Amino acid sequence: MANEAYPCPCDIGHRLEYGGLGREVQVEHIKAYVTKSPVDAGKAVIVIQDIFGWQLPNTRYIADMISGNGYTTIVPDFFVGQEPWDPSGDWSIFPEWLKTRNAQKIDREISAILKYLKQQCHAQKIGIVGFCWGGTAVHHLMMKYSEFRAGVSVYGIVKDSEDIYNLKNPTLFIFAENDVVIPLKDVSLLTQKLKEHCKVEYQIKTFSGQTHGFVHRKREDCSPADKPYIDEARRNLIEWLNKYM
């Protein structure tokens, strides 16, 4: 788990200059970014933000990448108008900031988004992908909502509790070897719990030499050594959705 002195040392990394292919919409009480699939296959993916919010271009880039593979994607504002974390902010107040943005208390928003995807986008199969804060949300949601056909949790903090294994549908977990937010002992705990108790398909992948945020907050060309891992993780994400949706 993250330490108290630096409770969630998430570096915003390389903020992409990216305009996006989708559009912003209002879904009941939530703003959201939606990208329609070029092929109407009746499949949709909810992409859940990290602590830097739903408007981060990097997250929208990933949503558009997923959309290009046959899925309508939606990036809702799960902070519901509250400010995202400022990367230059005082990390000592981060725990207090986080208390009003609980990744396990987004059921009202999920209900609204599911209704929108089914009624307005004609989605018959729905999956979820989330990063950091959103990765934690994905883990929680995959234990609660059986209608999510597949989930991908990307460096979501692992909660040390007895029910972390009770997944309802196939879930992929992506971690980074050198993640100071999520130590490898937490990944080992999750691995042990799932191996002992999980009754659905799952996979845990830890990427060598990588750090928190590597999948969606690094430029593809930022380092020749990192690029293969970024590409592989993104490919794994798409392959998991394709396999189970």
Curated annotation (Swiss-Prot):
Pfam families: DLH. Coiled coil: none annotated. The active site is at C132, D179, H212. Transmembrane segments: none annotated. The modification Phosphoserine is found at S223. InterPro entries: AB_hydrolase_fold, CMBL, Dienelactn_hydro. It is found in: Cytoplasm, Cytosol. Disulfide bonds: none annotated. Widely expressed, with highest levels in liver, followed by kidney, small intestine and colon. Present in liver and intestine (at protein level). The modification N6-acetyllysine is found at K36. GO terms for cellular component: cytosol; extracellular exosome. Its EC number is 3.1.-.-. SUPFAM superfamilies: alpha/beta-Hydrolases (SSF53474). Keywords: Acetylation, Cytoplasm, Hydrolase, Phosphoprotein. Strongly inhibited by p-chloromercuribenzoate (PCMB). Partially inhibited by bis-p-nitrophenylphosphate (BNPP). Not inhibited by DFP, PMSF, eserine or EDTA. It comes from the Eukaryota. GO terms for molecular function: hydrolase activity. One of its GO terms (biological process) is xenobiotic metabolic process. Cysteine hydrolase. Can convert the prodrug olmesartan medoxomil into its pharmacologically active metabolite olmerstatan, an angiotensin receptor blocker, in liver and intestine. May also activate beta-lactam antibiotics faropenem medoxomil and lenampicillin. This is Carboxymethylenebutenolidase homolog. It comes from Homo sapiens.
